[in-house]
Amino acid sequence: MLFYFLIWFCLFVFSLLEINNLQKEHSFFLFAISTFLLFFLSFVRWETGTDWDGYYEYFNHIFYYFQDSDFEFGFARINEIIKLTFGNYTILLFVFSCIIFFFQTKVILKYSPLPLFSLFFLWSISFANVFYIRQTVAIALLFYSTTFLVNKKTWLFFICIYIATLFHSTSFVFVFAYFLFRLRITVKQMFFFLLMSFLFSIFLVSVFNSILPLVGGIIQHKLETYLALGEDGGGHESIFSG
């Protein structure tokens, strides 16, 4: 965990410099270096992140195209292409890292007045999506889809949501962002909704903890695993492959 704290501390210092009127070219340089290092870390990591074992096992048991799986179409097809072409899991991590960091960085640079602070914020809440799962790929696409809302390109917004569903089926709920974007929400209301969401998430965790004794077998095991990963920051035990 010391390594992760050092990254947090560096981004924190960079953010303070940026807030205190760091020159734009210097800010961009620090942002570019930080983003590249996080991008590099995202695909050279090994045995880290949520559901690592499940995804790695699935990759190693791909033997032909359009193989039956419980994963979404886009995620499954990319896994098949990489496995049957290269047979290397690190290449798969690299491909997904490119997708995530491309869209994530593009939005930050376009809309954030403080890119370094945005990166620091992302690291604080989600390790800047370094330890991603297929849901993270979908979130990156949804994150980028908001640019089409801003530019009033509605059809591209919905196309982007559809592509995101190819990586995680729950992405379709983001269509409600179209209606929320048209609402006039004050800063106070926004903070109120964020606070309510945070309290609701705490409530859900307590509910899950209460019902765990009532469910058995694999369901209980998976719930306990996800709750434990949420408490320790995602289960990032090691970083680099050997």
Model-identified regions with their sequence ranges:
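Transmembrane-embedded, aromatic-rich helix segments that form part
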Residues: F157-I159, T170-F181
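Membrane-embedded helix bundles of polyisoprenyl
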Residues: P115-F143, F167-T170
